[in-house]
Amino acid sequence: MAENVQDIKRRIKSVNSTMQITHAMELVASAKLRKSRELAEGRRPYFEAMIESIGRIVEKSGNARNIFMDQREVKKTAYIIITGDKGLAGGYNVNVAKLVEEHITDKENAVLFTVGSRGRDHFRNREYHIQGEYLGISERPNFFNAKEVTAIVMEGFKNGEYDEVYIAYTKFVSTITQHAQMMKLLPLSAEELITSGKVKTTEETKEEKSKMSDRELTIMTYEPEPEELLKYLIPNFVSSTVYGSMIESAASEQGARRTAMESATTNANEMIDGLTLQYNRVRQAAITQEISEIVGGAEALN
C-alpha cells in the first residue's frame, strides 16, 4: 500500500512539472501572438494603398498589361506552403498540408516552395517535388524573407517553368479560430485587381478619397507610363501578399499553440486534482488499516 502511495506522488510530481512547462509555453505564445498581430496591423495601410494604386492604374489605362497578368494554359503549378518549424500547435500544420494535398490533382506537375520544416518534412516524406525550402523564419517573418521567396517564384513564372502560382497559409481570425486558406497568387487578374483596389481600403483612406472628385480621379496621369509603373508595383504587391500571408500564419500558429497549451494545462490540472484525490483515499485507507491492526493487536493481548 505504501508503495502505491509513493507511485501516486511520483505521478503528481511528473504531471505538475509538465503543467509548468505547458503554462510557460502558453505565456510565450501569447506574447508572440501579440507581436504578430501588431505586425499585421502595421503593414495593412501600405498594402491597401498599393493595391488601390495598381487597381486604379489598370482601370484608367485600359490596356496596361504586365507579364505577371498573362493567362496561359496550365501545365505546371507552383505552391508556396507556409507552415511552422515547430509542433505542439494543434492542427495548425496538418490543416495546411491537407489543404494542399486536396488541391493538387497531378503530383508530377506540382512544384513546392515550403516555408517551415513541418511542411517540408510532410511533403518530402510523400515524395513531392520541393524546389525551395525556407526554414527558421515562420515565427518571426520579415519583408526580406517574403521578397526572397517571391523573387524566385516570380522568376520561375516569368521563364515559363510553371503557369500559375498558389499560396497556402493560415488566416488568423481570433486566438481560438484559424482557417487554412488557398489563394491564387499568379497570374494576376485585371478585374480582381480593379475590384480589390476599390474595396480593400480602410475608413481613413475612404475619407481621403471622398475629398477627391470623380473628375480629379479620371484626369489623373501617371509618370512614367502605366506599364513601367506596373513593373515596379506588381512585384512589390506580390511580395506584400506573401509577407501578409506569412504574418497571418505566424499569428495563427501562436494562437493555435496558445490554445493547445492552455488546454494541456487545464487537463494537467484536472489530472493532478484526480491524482490528489486518489492519493488521499489510498493514504486514508493505509492509515485506517494501520489503526485496525493496532486495535486488533491490542484486543489479542487482552
Curated annotation (Swiss-Prot):
Its main location: membrane. It is found in: Cell membrane. One of its GO terms (biological process) is proton motive force-driven plasma membrane ATP synthesis. This is ATP synthase gamma chain, sodium ion specific. It is a peripheral membrane protein. Keywords: ATP synthesis, Cell membrane, CF(1), Hydrogen ion transport, Ion transport, Membrane, Transport. The lineage of its organism: Bacteria, Bacillati, Bacillota, Clostridia, Eubacteriales. It holds the Pfam family ATP-synt. GO terms for cellular component: plasma membrane; proton-transporting ATP synthase complex. F-type ATPases have 2 components, CF(1) - the catalytic core - and CF(0) - the membrane proton channel. CF(1) has five subunits: alpha(3), beta(3), gamma(1), delta(1), epsilon(1). CF(0) has three main subunits: a, b and c. NCBIfam families: ATPsyn_F1gamma. Belongs to the ATPase gamma chain family. Produces ATP from ADP in the presence of a proton gradient across the membrane. The gamma chain is believed to be important in regulating ATPase activity and the flow of protons through the CF(0) complex. The keyword Cell wall biogenesis/degradation does not apply. InterPro entries: ATP_synth_F1_ATPase_gsu, ATP_synth_F1_gsu, ATP_synth_F1_gsu_CS. Inhibited by nitrate. Coiled coil: none annotated. GO terms for molecular function: ATP binding; proton-transporting ATP synthase activity, rotational mechanism.
